[in-house]
Amino acid sequence: MIDMAEENGLYAIISYHVIGRPGGWYESDSDTTMLPNYPAKVHYTDSDMAVAFWNKVAARYGQKKHVLFEIYNEPAGKLDSTNDDFNWAVWRPTGQLLIDTVRKHSNNIILGSGPKYSSDLSEVPSNPYIDTNLVYVAHIYPNTVTKEEDQVAGWEKRFGFLTSTYPVIISEWGFHDGGKDETTRGTAEGFAKPFLDYLDQKNLPWVAYVYHPPDDEPPMLERDWVTLNEFGLFVKKRLEMAQ
């Protein structure tokens, strides 16, 4: 995949794709609505494993200039908490450790994540990462902003305000009208269009997630792995408009 991206003039993001709080493991609920006997997803979130991963991967791909390194997919507290105890101050030392690990092997762009499933960068200005080639990331979905909040104000509070000081990329966004995951449940008109219009106003890059059928959410494909659903068609149209 890395070589294919290079051959086609594309960037490639390598993500340490775990969810949870460093220092243990994280288990999601099993989901038999997706597939029969669908197992729970277990993420082993030990920091030593993350360091070992980046020592290996950054050393292997660190000289390929089209490769970006996303240090940790979604730092978060436990499923049964509000994540309020897992804030920027708690997460930042681990994030900085992983940044420093990648830097031993590469000068490429690093994508730095924040707490609450990479949805909240509000505390970054109080103690930002130390690095000279870093972009902050946010993962934003239809219900990242609570129903009690104004949608645009919620985006501005979580990541938009930071763009006047630091580079930011939305490395995950998407929607699924009817999926099990409440966080990703939304529509093109209610979420995707206003969200991408907001990103255009901020001149922010984005990566839609995920090019996959419905056993992962939010999917862009139907179960035949070929047919685009509402989300997939929306992304395709926006990419065509940008050409």
Language-model features: locations:
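Chitinase-like catalytic core of GlcNAc-active glycosidases
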Residues: 3, 18-20, 45-51
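Catalytic-core regions built around general acid/base machinery
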Residues: 1-7, 195-198
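Histidine- and aromatic-rich ligand-binding microenvironments
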Residues: 6, 15, 58
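Aromatic-lined carbohydrate-binding surfaces of glycoside hydrolases
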Residues: 2, 10-31
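Structural helix-adjacent loops and short alpha-helical linkers that scaffold large soluble proteins
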Residues: 7-9, 104
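Extracellular glycoside hydrolase catalytic/binding regions
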Residues: 40-68, 72-205, 209, 213, ...
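Catalytic nucleophile-loop/oxyanion-hole region of alpha/beta-hydrolase
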Residues: 29-45
